[in-house]
Curated annotation (Swiss-Prot):
Biological processes, Gene Ontology terms: glutaminyl-tRNAGln biosynthesis via transamidation; regulation of translational fidelity; translation
EC numbers for this chain: 6.3.5.-
Source lineage: Bacteria, Pseudomonadati, Pseudomonadota, Alphaproteobacteria, Rickettsiales
Source organism per UniProt: Rickettsia canadensis (strain McKiel)
Protein name: Aspartyl/glutamyl-tRNA(Asn/Gln) amidotransferase subunit C
Catalytic reaction annotation: L-glutamyl-tRNA(Gln) + L-glutamine + ATP + H2O = L-glutaminyl-tRNA(Gln) + L-glutamate + ADP + phosphate + H(+); L-aspartyl-tRNA(Asn) + L-glutamine + ATP + H2O = L-asparaginyl-tRNA(Asn) + L-glutamate + ADP + phosphate + 2 H(+)
UniProt-listed InterPro entries: Asp/Glu-ADT_sf_sub_c (IPR036113), GatC (IPR003837)
Function: Allows the formation of correctly charged Asn-tRNA(Asn) or Gln-tRNA(Gln) through the transamidation of misacylated Asp-tRNA(Asn) or Glu-tRNA(Gln) in organisms which lack either or both of asparaginyl-tRNA or glutaminyl-tRNA synthetases. The reaction takes place in the presence of glutamine and ATP through an activated phospho-Asp-tRNA(Asn) or phospho-Glu-tRNA(Gln).
HAMAP family: GatC
Subunit structure: Heterotrimer of A, B and C subunits.
UniProt keyword list: ATP-binding, Ligase, Nucleotide-binding, Protein biosynthesis
The family this protein is said to belong to: Belongs to the GatC family.
Length: 100
């Protein structure tokens, strides 16, 4: 069982702040987690291969293709209004001021 003092020390190391009533709950939960880890450590896994994927299927790989990723012209073709021409020239979206 993790004591209240140990829980406070762990919280301090993790830079967490708890109210006094929450430290007790944290201590209990942390003790439960440590008990679960102890149970898992008792399991004999020496004859079990490490799991690298939850699925037995192999991922299909594809060849890399170099393509143009400059989509600014396509995006800016849809700009309308007074700022459309300027937006296309400077390649920026012109928006109304948001922050005063």
């Amino acid at each position: 069982m993790i004591t209240k003092e140990e829980a406070q020390k762990i919280a301090k190391l993790a830079r967490l702040k708890f109210e006094e009533d929450t430290v007790e709950k944290f201590s209990t939960q942390l003790s439960s987690i440590m008990n679960m880890i102890d149970i898992l450590n008792e399991i004999d896994c020496k004859d079990i291969e490490p799991l690298t994927s939850v699925s037995n299927m192999n991922a299909r790989m594809r060849e890399d293709e170099v393509t143009s990723s400059d989509l600014s012209d396509k995006l800016l073709d849809h700009v309308s209004g007074q700022s459309a021409q300027l937006a296309k020239e400077v390649k920026y979206f012109i928006t109304p001021k948001v922050i005063e």
